Amino acid sequence: MLLHIPNVLNAEQLRIVRERLDTAGDAWVDGRATAGYQGAPVKRNQQIAEHTPIARELGDVILASIERNPLFISSVLPNQVYPPLFNRYEGGMQFGSHVDGAVRVLPNGVKLRTDVSVTLFISDPADYDGGELVIEDTYGVQQVKLPAGDMIVYPATSLHQVTPVTRGVRVASFFWVQSLVRSDTQRAMLFDMDTAIQRLNATNADDAARRSLVGIYHNLLRTWSEP
């Protein structure tokens, strides 16, 4: 399931994040430092070094926002979230076609299975040319270039790339989530059911039928989840 989540960061949060990243200086390093053997040969960008104070500070802003975002919670069903990272593309930089690694290691040494990949756009799309996130999924090729503050979530199993940035600078945050539900198909079904339940809650739908659907949702989540 590929889902656009709007307005994850508000204007004030974006201003703070941009100002901190614009003045990050030597915290920006070669992005290949965090790439696996498959990604390194096709990766040309810069990243904020992992586990640095600025990465933790700005990552906490994003984590606090997604924890309060009902659309993110409903669609991703997060169990563990990898600390957000930050990247920058300019002057022809790109990231060729690749699949994200299956496992990441958290700062405390715990391994995280990457079920869902997340990109949060920090630059406004008018500020750069190119830089589309191109995702290949079961419905074909999707080109994604969202307003600043908006987020795209998609299965980490997807082949994807970032096209060359030919003008301006593209800055984004990216991270991975281990979901309570490993299967993308099952997550999508639960999301659709939860969305339908929320719509019923806003109407005068039969209360007994609504309670029955809520029970089915939680029983499916109980069956499929891996806490």
Swiss-Prot record:
Cofactor(s) required for function per UniProt: Fe(2+); L-ascorbate
Protein origin, superkingdom: Bacteria
Cofactor note: Binds 1 Fe(2+) ion per subunit.
InterPro entries assigned to the protein according to its UniProt record, in alphabetical order: Oxoglu/Fe-dep_dioxygenase_dom (IPR005123), PKHD_C (IPR041097), PKHD_hydroxylase (IPR023550), Pro_4_hyd_alph (IPR006620), Pro_4_hyd_alph_FE2OG_OXY (IPR044862)
Ranges for domain Fe2OG dioxygenase: 80-179
Entries under SUPFAM superfamilies matching the protein: Clavaminate synthase-like
Binding site residues for 2-oxoglutarate: 170
Residues at which Fe cation binds: 98, 100, 160
Catalytic activity, EC: 1.14.11.-
One Gene Ontology molecular-function label: iron ion binding
Example of a GO biological process term: intracellular iron ion homeostasis
Record-linked Pfam families: 2OG-FeII_Oxy_3, PKHD_C
Enzyme class: oxidoreductase
Keywords: Dioxygenase, Iron, Metal-binding, Oxidoreductase, Vitamin C
HAMAP family the record matches: Hydroxyl_YbiX (MF_00657)
PANTHER family assigned: PKHD-TYPE HYDROXYLASE YBIX (PTHR41536:SF1)
Record-linked NCBIfam families: PRK05467.1-3 (NF003974), PRK05467.1-4 (NF003975)
Name this polypeptide is given: PKHD-type hydroxylase Bxeno_B2756
